[in-house]
Amino acid sequence: MEGPHTRALAEHLNDVVTGKMVERILVPEHRWQANMLLLNCVGQVVQRVRSHGKWLFFDFSHGISWVCQLITKAKWAIVPTEANEKYLTPPPPPPTPSRPHKRHRPPLITVCFRAQTSTPPIVAILTGHPAFFILPTEKVWAHPEIRALGPDPIGSPDFHDDFPYRLRQHPTRTVAATLLDQEIVAGLGNALKCEILFATRFSPSAKIGALMASQIDRLASSVVALVATATTFAGKGLPFPYRVYDRAGLLCTVCNTEIAVDRSGQDAHLSWYCPTCQPVGQEPNLFSA
């Protein structure tokens, strides 16, 4: 899940569960052996849900945070009220299946939140295989995976200073590769990378060392603008209107040139781009479609 979708999810969860007390937590015994650190959050109040890049943070009133990255089809979801009982009933031990890959898997975590005893509970479920840590809130940024993250385009107030500085430490790398480096900028995926390159007129082969200061500043502004726009679309459940990503062979909406694909990236990510609209740093590419 890319940063904009993670932020939109964090904002939704924050609206729904902040200020609510954790009434129950169900953890399938065959998975996590009723992890006591997790269950110690029962009776605590959610202070806020926030995000940084592709990571979610649930901060609780007793100084503990859940830190979660939704990878490998992992997902947080709020259960419709009418389905609460289905998820609040502890699942039976799983039978030995004849075809394990067809087995229905229960949620990894089921959390029941409640504001008042007279109101229906709010049930949230975590499914899939996320990266998940339980940490003291004050030490979250000391965790190696979190400490290594670069600035968040719309969550870090010093982004316009920090991002260019980190970028300039890699003069021989392409802009395309650095935009996917989570230690340089947190939350970008390949789709937004392609759109940012298009917005700034940078070729996928453009090198950091060849950019002027004004071009790097323009790149930083485009990153912020496109991440903010993508977050708005994600929050409304709308598809992002991509102009180059995954549009190989279609005509550019600006100049009518066919969208091409650059396959030369050493990180194995494809870059969709317009050869006419993105001349900055363009080099002969023997691998174009």
Language-model regions, residue ranges each:
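Basic, nucleic-acid-binding surfaces and adjacent catalytic neighborhoods in DNA/RNA-processing proteins
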Residues: 21-37, 41, 50, 162-289
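Acidic/polar residues in short coil/turn loops that connect beta-strands
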Residues: 62, 115-117, 268
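Generic recognition of long tandem-repeat/solenoid scaffolds
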Residues: 56-60, 111-113, 272
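General N-terminal leader/first-domain-start detector
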Residues: 1-25, 31
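Short secondary-structure junctions
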Residues: 21-24, 44-49, 78-79, 89, ...
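A short, compositionally biased
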Residues: 51-53, 103-110, 246-248
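Phosphate/anion-contacting hairpin/loop surfaces
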Residues: 66-187, 192-199
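N-terminal functional module of multi-domain proteins
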Residues: 5, 9, 27, 33-36, ...
